[in-house]
């Protein structure tokens, strides 16, 4: 769990472990009702995904999620593919191409892989993004003056989900003369399943 000291500051043990290892796992931050809300809303969004990459309609013939957006929202992959690995995407941060097993013949030609900009489609995702305890952790790591700026949902369905190799996020400040361990910010990763 997230632990705060008597002054309301994030436990120093947590900050020290994060500094030493580069990650920290919080468990039971989101309550079961919050997780259920996330799962339900994600499934509702999925029913409104386009029928195929670049499609404007969902399987029910309605305008697809993000069809009216200028920026890309849904990234697709071939089933069990690794579209990022070994590529120049994101400044080449996914350095290794993962093995791409052959998917079952019954799988669809394309699988949803990444949903970008979920906050514009989901009240529940917005609530998680603004979760008071998570914002307190962000403040403890980044200081009071920080700006959350990105959200990405990776979709990994059984039997068709794409692979993502180990990588370090942040790709713009590694060579900075003012480099410090917090220069690239950090991520929260909420696991829905």
Tell me what each language-model feature is.
Residues 159, 185-189:
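Short gly/pro-enriched beta-turn/loop segments at secondary-structure junctions
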Residues 1-20, 27-181:
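Non-heme Fe(II)-dependent double-stranded beta-helix
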Residues 191-193:
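Short, intrinsically disordered, charge-balanced linker/junction segments flanking boundaries
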């Amino acid at each position: 769990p997230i632990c705060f000291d008597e002054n309301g500051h994030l436990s120093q043990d947590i900050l020290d472990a994060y500094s030493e290892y580069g990650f920290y796992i919080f468990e039971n931050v989101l309550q079961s009702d919050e997780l259920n809300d996330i799962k339900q809303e994600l499934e509702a969004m999925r029913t409104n995904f386009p029928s195929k990459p670049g499609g404007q309609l969902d399987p029910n013939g309605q305008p697809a999620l993000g069809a009216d957006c200028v920026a890309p929202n849904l990234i697709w992959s071939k089933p069990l593919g690794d579209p990022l690995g070994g590529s120049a995407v994101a400044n080449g941060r996914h350095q290794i191409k993962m093995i791409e097993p052959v998917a079952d013949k019954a799988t669809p030609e394309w699988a949803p892989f990444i949903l970008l900009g979920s906050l514009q489609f989901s009240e529940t995702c917005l609530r998680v993004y603004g979760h008071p305890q998570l914002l307190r952790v962000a403040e403890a790591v980044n200081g009071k003056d920080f700006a959350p700026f990105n959200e990405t949902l990776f979709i990994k369905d059984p039997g068709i989900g794409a692979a993502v190799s180990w990588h370090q996020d942040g790709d713009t400040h590694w060579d900075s003369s003012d480099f410090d361990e917090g220069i690239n910010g950090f991520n929260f990763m909420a696991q829905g399943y």
